[in-house]
Regions:
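Topogenic membrane-insertion module of multi-pass membrane proteins
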Residues: 1-51, 55, 59, 151-153, ...
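Hydrophobic alpha-helical transmembrane segments of integral membrane proteins
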Residues: 18, 26, 30, 53, ...
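Membrane-embedded alpha-helical segments that form the functional core of polytopic membrane enzymes
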Residues: 34-36, 45-71, 132-142, 192-209
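Short hydrophobic alpha-helical membrane-anchoring segments
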Residues: 38, 42, 65-72, 145-146, ...
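Solvent-exposed interhelical
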Residues: 66-110, 203-209
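Intramembrane alpha-helical segments
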Residues: 90, 94-190
Length: 209
């Protein structure tokens, strides 16, 4: 059986392909730090409206999904994901999604995240820092292993956040500091050292990477 036919024969249902492409096993790293930040704020202030924290959680999940999809796309077009790859299935490498489809899904997730980030930035006292978080989160999602165009195609080889040794730094900053402190800032407009316990989730992201 030709390779393409074999890949098509083993293709899961479309809904399952889409779920697998988002790497749902990694998404706890978006949920838990947000929960910790909101819990600390609630402990210090009492009853709080959970809506801003929930919206930020959706924002964080969409950023992570967009990052995962773009990583799937970039690793495939740059030749990092081949048929010899060992580990969790990658939708583009398996031929379940075309590179264009994966990139399009990544773009959709990041646009949705940016729209939520923009709405959170309109909250009193949140405009500057939330705008910064939104813009840099989208940039990091695209630059983690590829950038908006495969960097190997523009003469930069494998220079990217993930392949340059900076990946852990950005994971620490955004899945640790930002994801934990943002819900707290949205509720209190001030930071708290105890919220930094959410940084422990960074270890989980390292392991999944």
């Amino acid at each position: 059986m030709p390779a393409n036919s074999a890949k098509e024969a083993e293709r899961p249902p479309t809904w399952k392909v889409l779920v697998l492409a988002t790497r749902p096993n990694t998404l706890a790293a978006s949920f838990t730090p947000v929960l910790v930040g909101f819990a600390v704020a609630s402990r210090e202030l009492g009853a709080l409206d959970p809506a801003p924290a929930f919206r930020f959680w959706v924002f964080a999940c969409l950023i992570q999904i967009g990052t995962n999809l773009h990583n799937d796309y970039a690793d495939f077009v740059k030749g990092a994901d081949t048929d010899d790859r060992v580990g969790q299935a990658r939708a583009t490498q398996k031929g379940w999604l075309s590179p264009g489809q994966t990139a399009g899904l990544s773009t959709a997730a990041l646009v949705a995240a940016a729209s939520i980030g923009a709405s959170l930035a309109r909250r009193p006292g949140c405009g500057g820092w939330m705008t910064f978080v939104t813009i840099t989160s989208v940039f990091n999602a695209l630059a983690y292993t590829g950038g908006p165009f495969p960097l190997g195609y523009v003469g930069l080889g494998n220079v990217s956040i993930g392949y340059s040794g900076l990946g852990d730094v950005f994971v620490f900053a955004y899945f640790g500091l930002v994801a934990t402190l943002a819900p707290y800032y949205l509720a209190l407009e001030a930071g708290a050292p105890r919220a930094l316990f959410g940084l422990l989730l960074t270890a989980g992201v390292y392991a999944s990477g």
